[in-house]
Every structure is written in structure tokens, then in C-alpha cells.
A protein has these predicted regions:
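Domain-level signature for soluble enzymes in the chorismate/prephenate branch of the shikimate pathway
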Residues: 2-336
């Protein structure tokens, strides 16, 4: 079952706010949304921006654990990053998505700003070490070149690095994370926006369980049937459409496998060109258990759902495997 059957509208990554009530039937509880990381992480900030302040954010240590959260009854939805404008795709998320019975129902693009955060009273001159996720450290290379005395300390999570610094009370240590981490843990921002590239954005997707054959048991989540899930599926398209600032459009993510022969990829892409479907992204990933053979992940976009269905019908005959990973309105470009 797909949430988006047609061009329902466009999600605004800056303006979309949706408050969801209980997923369990109680008016006093809120939608539980799993994410990878600690409280104060960019994923949590994206979930709150997309779904509203009333959600209950469920932090998990790893992507694997986050994907299991729904099956384990710890959450009803999952918010996961799939792509960064500088670092590229989050390949583990794509692998887990393909193994699961979760489907993309919405997306949001979040600007990524890295701040240097320390204990209250700490100063930049007094720092000796800076901790954060390796990707965040790498995206702040110019800052470290300007402050060569600072030791870089890899950490599991951006927000977690700030939490640990604040818990230690060590004024000679700091972490790199988003502003929300400083707010969450009471940290002081010692230097703002220290990332090398201001055009740094991460695309996050909201995932819900759907009926899907072939899902691996540990990731096969029960299909949510509570009133709040029904409300989410009913209200989200209209709310996103209300905030659209361009003609309604439909985005579709899919995975496919092809015969190992010349021209197979060209034959698979021709239906999109023939029907005027815009190919936004194509990326290959190894097929687990089949060395040197690959599957492809695609994102396409159109304002003509009928043409998209025609293209998909033609695509099925050109592929050995085809799975729709989600239909949803494209998020507005956060850099606009």
C-alpha cells in the first residue's frame, strides 16, 4: 500500500509541521519516531521539523537498531538520512531499506551547520581536543587547519560527543554538532558554522511499514493499524500540499536488478526518457551474496502520474527484480 498514489504536492523542508496524536490509541501519548543517534542529533531535528514537537523521539545507537525499532514495538515510524550533498548516499540505510518492509512516505532536506560546543565558561583558546563523528570532523577541515593544536577525537555521534563533553565538565574539550545539541545538553557555542562548505544539506526520509513480500524477519515490522497511523496517512499529503510552493509533483524511489548482458541498463532507462520522466539519481550497489553483480537505486520525478505508471509497466519487462521504495512529494530545495 502506497501513501502517495499521485501528485499530492510538495513538502517544504522549512515550513512543514505536522502534529500527530497517539499511535497507540491513547490521547496522551505521541507518535514514536526512531532515529539513529543521540538526542540532539540532526536526525531528531529533522523528525521534529517534519512531524512537529509532539513526537516522541526514540534514539538508537545504530542504523540496524533503528530499523528494528518498529518490529520490536519501540516505535511506529523511522526517520533516516539517505543522502548528504557532500558525502553522498548513506549506503547502509539503502541496504536496510531493501531488506525491510518499510516504505518512504515523505522526505525533508535539512541544512547542516556544524558548531563547536563546549562547557559553559570554556574558551576556544583553552581547548585541547574536539570530538565528533568522523564525517563532521572531516567537514570542518579548514577550522582544524587554522587551529592545528586541537586534537581530533572520533566519536559515534555528533550530539553524543557534546553530551559526553558536558557530562565530563572538561573545559579543555569540545564537540562538534548542531545547535540543537547545545540546547539539549546546556552547552556553550564557542564557534559557529565551522563547516568548510555552507552548501551542506542532508536528505532524510520518513519510513512506515507496509505489506511487502520477501522482507527479512528481523526487519519485518508489523503493519500499523492504529487510529493515529490512519490519521497520518490521511493528513500528511494535504498538509504537505498546503506548503507547496511549486506545481504538484511526485517523486518515486525504486530498486531494480538487471540481466547481466550488454544494453540491459540502457533498456531499463529508456522507458523514463520515452515518457518524459526526470531521472534524479541512479546509483549501483553490490548484490549481497552474488559477487560482482549489482542492483540499482533510482529516484525519479514527474508531474504526470499516468506517464510514470506507463514507464513502470515497461520497466518491469526489462528487469529481473523491481521494488518501489516509496512515492512521495519532493521536498523543496533547502538551498533555495
Amino acid at each position: 500500500m502506497a501513501l502517495w498514489a499521485g501528485c499530492a504536492g510538495v513538502a517544504s523542508s522549512r515550513q512543514t509541521v505536522l502534529t500527530i496524536s497517539s499511535m497507540s490509541g491513547s490521547k496522551n501519548s505521541s507518535l514514536r519516531v526512531a532515529f539513529q543517534g543521540e538526542h540532539g542529533a540532526f536526525s531528531e531535528a529533522a523528525a521534529i521539523q517534519l512531524l512537529g514537537e509532539s513526537i516522541t523521539a526514540v534514539p538508537r545507537a545504530t542504523f540496524d537498531s533503528a530499523f528494528r525499532a518498529i518490529a520490536e514495538g519501540a516505535a511506529e515510524a523511522l526517520l533516516a538520512p539517505v543522502e548528504n550533498s557532500l558525502a553522498g548516499s548513506v549506503v547502509r540505510v539503502y541496504d536496510l531499506l531493501l531488506e525491510s518492509n518499510l516504505e518512504i512516505v515523505a522526505e525533508i532536506i535539512l541544512p547542516i551547520e556544524h558548531h563547536l560546543i563546549g562547557c559553559p565558561g570554556a574558551t576556544l583558546d583553552g581547548l585541547q581536543s574536539v570530538a565528533s563523528h568522523p564525517m563532521a570532523l572531516a567537514q570542518c577541515e579548514r577550522f582544524f587547519l587554522s587551529h592545528p593544536r586541537l586534537k581530533r577525537v572520533p566519536a559515534e555521534d555528533t550530539a553524543g560527543s557534546v553530551r559526553d563533553v558536558l557530562a565530563s565538565g572538561n573545559k579543555s574539550a569540545a564537540g562538534i554538532a548542531g545547535r540543537q545539541a547545545a540546547t539539549r545538553y546546556g552547552g556553550a557555542i564557542l564557534a559557529e558554522s565551522i563547516q568548510d562548505n555552507a552548501e551542506n544539506f542532508t536528505r532524510f526520509v520518513l519510513l512506515l511499514p507496509v505489506h511487502r513480500e520477501g522482507a527479512v524477519d528481523p526487519l519485518h515490522s508489523p503493519i500499523a493499524t492504529s487510529p493515529a497511523v490512519t490519521d497520518l496517512m490521511r493528513e500528511l499529503p494535504a498538509r504537505l500540499a498546503e506548503r507547496s510552493q511549486r506545481p504538484p509533483s511526485l517523486k518515486l524511489s525504486l530498486a531494480l536488478r538487471l540481466a547481466h548482458k550488454p544494453g540491459a541498463l540502457l533498456a531499463a532507462l529508456e522507458p523514463f526518457a520515452h515518457h518524459g520522466i526526470n531521472l534524479l539519481k541512479i546509483e549501483s550497489r553490490p548484490i549481497h551474496g552474488t559477487p560482482w553483480e549489482y542492483q540499482f537505486f533510482l529516484d525519479v520525478q514527474t508531474d504526470a502520474p499516468t506517464q510514470l505508471e506507463a514507464a513502470l509497466n515497461e520497466l518491469r519487462s526489462a528487469t529481473s527484480f523491481l521494488r518501489i521504495l516509496g512515492r512521495y512529494p519532493p521536498a523543496l530545495d533547502a538551498s533555495a
